[in-house]
Swiss-Prot record:
Species the sequence originates in: Homo sapiens
Region named Disordered: 1-68
Impact noted for substituting T40A: No effect on interaction with EDC4
Site location (Required for interaction with EDC4): L30, W34
Protein name: Negative regulator of P-body association
Oligomeric and partner information: Interacts with mRNA decapping proteins DCP1A, DCP2 and EDC4.
Compartments (UniProt record): Cytoplasm, P-body
Amino acid sequence: MGDQPCASGRSTLPPGNAREAKPPKKRCLLAPRWDYPEGTPNGGSTTLPSAPPPASAGLKSHPPPPEK
């Protein structure tokens, strides 16, 4: 009878923890936005990484037309 509870995995964390450890890992994959907002569909990439490049190109492209 003592083996049954252990085999159930309810008292033991190995079986239960192993299955619960997988879900948290999936959350980490969705939480990468904070890790690297560069490839975030939230627009974070356009806020820091994309912002600098476009801003420089925009400033250089704008001056030419006004000059004419």
